[in-house]
């Protein structure tokens, strides 16, 4: 006798069987068929140079990600993408490792953006529109409330404009912008203690969570498209043409 038959006999003794007893088996069989019908991941290993033992598969199709100018994880491991004008939270409802749907949680971020995203506590910071935008209510799971722009205006959406946001080990939010981001003199610097006194071309800024205190920590580059940080808090970037 099979395990499934033993379980069936336990929950549905012979004297109580009938149509009701037959239904759970039908539902279980249907669920099994659904699992069998799931689409297998599409591997694209041949399009990349990978270390031995590593694989890459397509996590989501374009209908879920949109234009996808940026991608991050929030503190719970959920995926956010910028879809050219808004922020989408991708959803894997059947938990098969493929994200087939999404929910728009923030809007009004202009064209070709957002190109910088960061979830920090209950807030979402996004680079789009006229600069760094603050949205609140992230932990509610619903659409977020736009609190407005933080700091002075930045140009966004361009290759040489404002880009990546990072959370530093010191609790500050870090932003990198290219030489087309609108940096000049002390346009964005608010603090006398700023390590860099004047903004010049591409720069890295840091600001507090409220977005009221701004400092410049690096300047003089050309067009860094992104910004990385290692476990020591050191920053890394590159020029887009070098």
Question: What annotation goes with each model-predicted range?
Answer:
Residues 1-16:
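N-terminal secretory signal peptides that target proteins for export/translocation
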Residues 13-14, 21, 191, 198:
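N-terminal targeting/docking segments
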Residues 17-22, 117:
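Alpha-helical transmembrane segments
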Residues 32-36:
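Sec/Tat signal peptide C-region and signal peptidase I cleavage site
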Residues 37-242:
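Beta-propeller domains with acidic blade repeats across secreted/periplasmic ectodomains
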